[in-house]
Regions:
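Adenine nucleotide-associated cytosolic modules
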Residues: 1-115
């Protein structure tokens, strides 16, 4: 999704996925479109960031950026719920991206590791 593209509809998968949001007067169809057109940057995919990222993706944010410079360690797994045992040793940004895409394939994920700069 390019930042210049604005969506004005939900596809059938999104309508089913966000059915509860669509029935809420506080969100509704227009609100869900606004979420789809929104971008969020999360600095850190650790303790707090790991939970926030999952909720943002589940809510329907269209584009999420993740910045982190750390690798997944076994000791992270009890509190950083976005990461899994099979991602130990991977960059947290890659682990988080993989998990978010499983949760919501409609969400665009952009990553930046400060290690590579």
């Amino acid at each position: 999704m390019s930042k210049d593209i604005k969506f004005n509809f939900l596809n059938s998968d999104e309508e089913e996925r966000y059915q509860k949001h669509l029935t809420l007067k506080e969100i509704g169809y227009e609100g869900q479109i606004n979420l789809k057109n929104s971008s969020v940057l999360c600095i850190g995919a650790g303790g707090l960031g790991s939970s926030v990222l999952l909720y943002l993706a589940a809510a329907g944010i269209g584009r999420i950026g993740i910045v982190d410079n750390d690798q997944v360690e076994k000791s992270n797994l009890q509190r950083q719920i976005i990461h899994e045992t099979n991602t130990i040793g991977n960059l947290k940004i890659d682990s988080a991206k993989e998990r978010i895409k499983k949760l919501n394939p409609n969400c665009e994920i952009l990553t930046l590791s400060l290690i590579h700069i």
